[in-house]
Amino acid sequence: MAQSAFMPPTYYCSFCGRNQDEVDRLVTGPGALFICNECIELLSAIIANEERKEAPHAPILPPTLPIPHAIRDHLDEYVIGQDRAKKVMAVAVYNHYKRLRAQAQGDTDVEIQKSNILLVGPTGSGKTLLAQTLARMLDVPFAIADATALTEAGYVGEDVETILLRLIQAADGDVDRAQMGILYIDEIDKIARKADNPSITRDVSGEGVQQALLKILEGGVVNVPPMPGRKHPQQEFIPFDTTNVLFICGGAFEGLEHHIAERMGSGGTLGFGKTIVKEERLERSKKLLSLVNPDDLLHFGFIPEFIGRMPVVAALTPLDKDAMMRILTEPRNAIIKQYQKMLALDHVQLEVSGDAMEAIVERALAGKTGARGLRTAVEEILLDVMFDLPSETDVVRCVITAETVRDGAMPTLIRRTSSRSRAGKQPTTKAS
């Protein structure tokens, strides 16, 4: 009796059999029945899927299919430079959805295989932004997965099938629509084989992941767990056909240009035997990456089967100073425009001098993180200002100069003239 008073009873989920210590929550029903939170989510997903089958479907394919020129023009609004990569992606995406439209209309006399895309380029060159912009333009489900988190099935890490769950979630659970979406796999270069020669230690996050990805890249029905994380035998998997999913893989592939240079005949020359000096390194890298071929990827550590499933390769070039300056101000989502809008919500006008922009670009280039470094630099410069502005209601303008960027001086804050001041008095200036 004493033991039962101090030891609470153990309750089990009537569906999966786990007790209250193994789940987040147990819900009590009539007749001593219990159901855990995970089984509730699973049953809700099953019911919602059945209801979707009975309800009218949203259009699976994009309602309109822009031509390659229109796709490239749209990309130009958001991504600076990378003209060759834009053209390659515009053609590949147009052909992919044109193929799906033909299939939907019953035109199947010739079987056209899909062309997945491999983006090769340094960090911050626009790989992810290109894929995101394409998906947003076409209004198709889009998801991003990180290849570094993937491991071969049976090992600690994320199974390759679970990345498809993100695409289902992006389609609001509509599996049919998700099967026509775009999945971007970032950091794909990190799953390269660790060495040219097979090791006695199993490479579960390198070649093992490449092997596991082959089926979903090629196209076929894959069983996707309805919830990420721990699996249990009672869960019902979601059949997912990847045949019509467009896979875009991207990676920095650091060091790849060295092998391309060796293949071209000399590590120090390119083209007409011209010696490449230090100041020409950026242009050299641009030219070399544009010459990447399957042999280079094989040497980098990718198995032939994986390379064969990524037939479209687009090289993105490193961003130079001029491109970085344009990224700051020209695109629709330009970084300076974003922060000007952010401060405008606090009724403050942000001004950035031309010299300050050059200094921001120099700081980003020194960090070697591409366009991402621009946002980091601006965020650091404006951190204190954005912290204080909501408390200082008399500030009307914030000015960033080159000294602010290079020397760490505080941005100049222009304050509103006090209502008690004489008419016509100029606003006071305060460096804070």
From Swiss-Prot:
Keyword Metal-binding belongs to the record: yes
Residue positions binding Zn(2+): C13, C16, C36, C39
Binding positions for ATP per the UniProt entry: P122, T123, G124, S125, G126, K127, T128, L129
Region Disordered, annotated ranges: 412-432
Pfam families assigned to the protein according to its UniProt record, in alphabetical order: AAA_2, ClpB_D2-small, zf-C4_ClpX
BP-aspect Gene Ontology terms: cell division; proteolysis involved in protein catabolic process
Residue span, ClpX-type ZB domain: 1-55
InterPro entries: AAA+_ATPase, ATP-dep_Clp_protease_ClpX, ATPase_AAA_core, Clp_ATPase_C, Clp_protease_ATP-bd_su_ClpX, ClpX_bact, P-loop_NTPase, Znf_CppX_C4
UniProtKB keywords: ATP-binding, Chaperone, Metal-binding, Nucleotide-binding, Zinc
Keyword Nucleotide-binding in annotation: yes
Cellular component annotations (GO), alphabetically ordered: HslUV protease complex
GO molecular function, one term: ATP binding
Known partners and oligomeric status: Component of the ClpX-ClpP complex. Forms a hexameric ring that, in the presence of ATP, binds to fourteen ClpP subunits assembled into a disk-like structure with a central cavity, resembling the structure of eukaryotic proteasomes.
HAMAP family: ClpX (MF_00175)
Function text: ATP-dependent specificity component of the Clp protease. It directs the protease to specific substrates. Can perform chaperone functions in the absence of ClpP.
UniProt xrefs under PANTHER family: ATP-DEPENDENT CLP PROTEASE ATP-BINDING SUBUNIT CLPX-LIKE, MITOCHONDRIAL, ATP-DEPENDENT CLP PROTEASE ATP-BINDING SUBUNIT CLPX-LIKE, MITOCHONDRIAL-RELATED
Family: Belongs to the ClpX chaperone family.
Protein name per UniProt: ATP-dependent Clp protease ATP-binding subunit ClpX
Record organism: Herpetosiphon aurantiacus (strain ATCC 23779 / DSM 785 / 114-95)
